[in-house]
């Protein structure tokens, strides 16, 4: 080497990462090409909430996405990773409502709708970019100039377009149906926003008197009805029994007198009833229970709504027919002393009144799940409200076929069944929400209640020929957030305009997401996309070809991470590190329950206590590459992941290993990259072959979305082949090889390091770029960034099975000698004589050709091959297959120690022989196993038995000393 090359002792991630990322972004490396001839590869990122900050789930999924994007960019594909954030209607509105309440003592109603929405936009401008900045810290190679927000003008236009077209096609309608109602937030919420909490409740058994003198089979003049919700009694419109329940056969079609309300309601038969639950008789309240609502539809029952939007008892019941229209012929009176009562107060009063009327039969303890709104924090109430709906069955049929016929693949495949189960039992989708923040529904009303749907008010007037002075009022509701995010893959590419981006990048390639939103988001994207996006032949396009479903990231004990458990880990803290004091503040600050905070603090202090290397406690800095590599290495298909700080630490060490290996190569003053004759060694050929096999393994793993196997292939090659063996195998060449051998090894070292960096780059972008910028000059490679270099391919000509086999055998010999040293407590510096016996002719040639390598690696003075029958001096022996590896004992081996070691080796081989004998004596195994398998087992047993004989002979010889 003509000049000394300097390289820092260690990789300082904190000094490198952000500057590198800024450079990448400024240079426009993340931007896709505009050349339509280049094959495209596109991933649309699941848009995180604009309110949010990066959590481990984001870091996990985005690491996998960026790995695919960087790999495909290096493959020469035109890559687009479409990023953006979701306006997150209810979550964002609540954040800003809490903010103005805390800072100004005001509510949104004090501001009014327009001013409050402006407040949200101000908040979004100030703090809405937090998550985007954190995504940069992860190294995400996103074209940020294309970042989208679901409330952008372009996306808002797409939302209006979809709404209007679906309405014109009769697939969007307005109707009164049962929804999850949050009585605190005054909005309908989706099933995803409902949290079912285990609760110790009661099962009340009420007596409903039979009408007209009718009696039960056992002579009673009443039915006992079991319920967990007495407060809805006033809304009952039937009681139901199972059609095959013999106890009540004679009563089907008769009536009972509803207590408190004093109206007759029918006894109906329906298979929904569980004969084993309670008494086998249940009350049917179609206006206040989802199952009862379906029963009511089947039996054309009226619906009696007895609750206000606050979940208080109404002054006057709202009575509707099964079609959702007012039913004036049905009388449902609410007693005066119930009117205005809060629902749980009403519950107590109903129970007390039944007891006073001698109609309370019994109360039993009952475990149940109570549905809570995850934002409002109060029990939700099934409520009949006027809402907008999408009739999704026609869309679902097409979307189901796309998965059935393989246009869309789920990985792992079992999630297809979950998808099918939802899609084949799909219900109309309530898309309206009683919020202010979101896409306002493009519908207007005149004073007569007529509804007009169009993109704008001006379009309404033109379309329906309405005079300018006719007052119109826009619908107050906004659309469910999932409605706009359902358009994500095509609205972000410019639809409804037929943009070049839409033509180039749609269909996208893969969606990486969690199983919990397969229905709420994935299915709706498939439905909407296939309905609105068609190819040039009119065939519906799918939004993506593959859905890769990830598991959850859990804590080390397998618990779900949550603030209330105090076990949340921030990915940025994994990267930068955090002191114990700051971690405690982050985990316990602003907690409502001080007792819980102390428990969390105690657990955190124990888990992240001070250590000699981290005197302040907390979490050490690991850098982004170590975090990404850990996430990839843990990404086993579809399984939840228990986070492991030890693995993170191990992969930080792996980054250091790669850095140190690079230092060894680049600062080696014997490196000779001059032109001239080259003579490649066996080790050179072996490492090239091993590398190419690793490239094949990595590529295959990525094709199967086995990120764990891809990461492991890099780790195994880098640590166990390149660093632990090849770098050591080069030292004898540089010390004693010819000029041609030194040149060959130098070129192999540099070339292989450069290719290895390219192989690892998709998972570990920062350290590979930093080293590559140094190594490219040595390797004679032109280019501005490693990410723009080609990804390594499998070079078939460099696959060399013979070289791999020979090196692996030599490694076994070296390991055998090293083990003898360790077990006999011989100093590493002590040079040894080596004897080998029972070698084949080919093995003898390998030994002869690699004397330099063996003597250096095993610290030997000589290597001698014993001929058949030639006696060896008293030696310590190891077996490598049939070959005996012998180190003469003279002067440095303890007799007792060696006898103990031999005894242990003999026992080990005895156990192997017994295991095989047991297998071969098993008639079922012998009958079913192929002959080749049986022959292989017998050959192994013969080899072990031969080994035992040799070791026993050695044992006897030493014992006789």
Swiss-Prot record:
Catalyzes the attachment of valine to tRNA(Val). As ValRS can inadvertently accommodate and process structurally similar amino acids such as threonine, to avoid such errors, it has a 'posttransfer' editing activity that hydrolyzes mischarged Thr-tRNA(Val) in a tRNA-dependent manner. Residues 892-961 form a coiled coil. GO terms for cellular component: cytosol. Monomer. The lineage of its organism: Bacteria, Pseudomonadati, Pseudomonadota, Gammaproteobacteria, Pasteurellales. Gene3D superfamilies: HUPs, Isoleucyl-tRNA Synthetase, Domain 1, Valyl-tRNA synthetase, C-terminal domain, Valyl/Leucyl/Isoleucyl-tRNA synthetase, editing domain. InterPro entries: aa-tRNA-synth_I_CS, aa-tRNA-synth_Ia, Anticodon_Ia_Val, M/V/L/I-tRNA-synth_anticd-bd, Rossmann-like_a/b/a_fold, tRNA-bd_arm, tRNAsynth_Ia_anticodon-bd, Val-tRNA_synth_C_sf. ValRS has two distinct active sites: one for aminoacylation and one for editing. The misactivated threonine is translocated from the active site to the editing site. The C-terminal coiled-coil domain is crucial for aminoacylation activity. It is an enzyme of class 6 (ligase). It comes from Haemophilus ducreyi (strain 35000HP / ATCC 700724). Belongs to the class-I aminoacyl-tRNA synthetase family. ValS type 1 subfamily. Keywords: Aminoacyl-tRNA synthetase, ATP-binding, Coiled coil, Cytoplasm, Ligase, Nucleotide-binding, Protein biosynthesis. It holds the Pfam family tRNA-synt_1. ATP binds at residue 563. One of its GO terms (biological process) is valyl-tRNA aminoacylation. A motif ('KMSKS' region) lies at residues 560-564. Its main location: cytoplasm. This is Valine--tRNA ligase. Its EC number is 6.1.1.9.
